[in-house]
UniProtKB/Swiss-Prot annotation:
Domain of life of the native organism: Eukaryota
Region (Disordered): 41-69
Source species of the chain: Eptatretus stoutii (Pacific hagfish)
Single GO MF annotation: frizzled binding
Full protein name: Protein Wnt-9
Glycan attachment positions: N97
UniProt-annotated location(s): Secreted, Extracellular space, Extracellular matrix
Biased amino acid composition, Basic residues: 47-62
Gene: WNT-9
Keywords: Developmental protein, Disulfide bond, Extracellular matrix, Glycoprotein, Lipoprotein, Secreted, Wnt signaling pathway
GO cellular component, one term: extracellular space
Family: Belongs to the Wnt family.
Length: 130
């Protein structure tokens, strides 16, 4: 017959590129936070440590006692700044002396230090099948 007795609904993820774009937008406006403990009550609160991006300044946000804004549930937050991967450290060898492809990634890999170019000729056997 033409009647429906059961209706099935399901959730589906957005396309991968759309999810990546959304995550990148949130990353670009991520909020650095400070964790403060109320010694008397033993309660912990989280407060932003930097100003809100221009596009979010008109929106109302809850405040913690010292006047700092609390991040929303959808905000990406971080506690420490990322290390510079340009300089060598105990966590990273840095990017000095790395090979890059001119016009593609040298500006980012070389971290503004500039780079030397080299032209080379390479001969390889052709791997031909006769």
């Amino acid at each position: 017959s033409g009647s429906c007795t059961v209706r099935t609904c399901w959730r589906q993820l957005a396309p991968f590129t759309e999810m990546g774009r959304s995550l990148k937008q949130r990353y670009d406006v991520a909020v650095k936070v400070l964790s403060m403990t109320n010694e008397a009550a033993g309660e912990r609160t989280i407060a932003r440590s930097r100003r809100r991006p221009r596009e979010q300044r008109g929106q109302r946000r809850p405040k913690v006692s010292d006047g700092a804004l609390t991040p929303r549930g959808i905000d990406l937050v971080y506690v420490e700044d990322s290390p510079s991967y340009c300089r060598a450290s105990r966590y990273s060898p840095g990017t000095a002396n790395r090979s890059c492809q001119k016009g593609r990634n040298c500006d980012s890999i070389c971290c503004g230090r500039g780079y030397n170019t080299r032209v080379s000729s390479v001969q390889k056997p052709c791997q031909c099948q006769v």
